[in-house]
Amino acid sequence: MSTSTHEMSPAAARAAFREGVAVPTTGYSDGYAQANLMVLPKEYAFDFLLFAQRNPKPCPILGVLEPGQLNSELLPGGDIRTDIPKYRVYRDGELAGEYPDVTEFWRDDLVSFLIGCSFTFEGALLDNGIPVAHIEQGRNVPMYKTSIPTARAGRFHGPLVVSMRPIPASQIADAVRVTSRYPAVHGAPVHVGDPAAIGISDLASPDYGDAVEIPDGHIPVFWACGVTPQAAVMETKPSLAIAHAPGHMLVTDARDLQYQVP
């Protein structure tokens, strides 16, 4: 990825995505937080907010837009329908397609939830000398459905989804320490080591994103992931749901340090 995308302002990044750039957003706009998106009809909004409250590791809420609202302080002057590089649309729990914008599907009763994303703490990992494999390899982060259930809330339930980053064995404690300071963007890992222990049979076949090579001496480390709501949508089957395509996030105007705790 070019230096210019790392240095791009969030507004410039969103403008590029609005114009049709459709790439994963890891490494975009260094120093700014990124967010997952879940958009649901108002009739499902309370149940989903309760689901997020009961599952704060995969679903840390950064903001909620009013029904029909298109922007907020996280994307001032933006448009939630167009400012993400790629969207997914679900109907009755089935993936209907991926789209560069979702204006044609928009309704005034739709409530947008912005959910913390682990791309936000990748800069802190790099600043501490901890390598991030998918950035080094030019790939999307790999994500996997697990055998760990989420806490049910109203109509919403489903499996926990995790992202995976292979970390040098000698730096795992540092990775835990660094990411634990970002609870609003998934925080510390939920699992280290054997993927089979959480129901993942093959790291080379992620459910979302791209597989990455695991270098010698590296251990797979798993963080709760904001794609978990999409897995819940597949189980819950709301009439309509709109989300980001995995790895294609909303680049917000919030500084990543806003979500760092001492």
Swiss-Prot record:
Keyword Lyase in annotation: yes
Keywords: Lyase
Enzyme class: lyase
Presence of keyword Lipoprotein: no
GO MF annotation terms: lyase activity
EC number: 4.2.1.-
InterPro entries per the UniProt record, alphabetical: D-Glu_cyclase, Putative_hydro-lyase, UPF0317
Family: Belongs to the D-glutamate cyclase family.
Protein name: Putative hydro-lyase cu1581
Species whose genome carries this gene: Corynebacterium urealyticum (strain ATCC 43042 / DSM 7109)
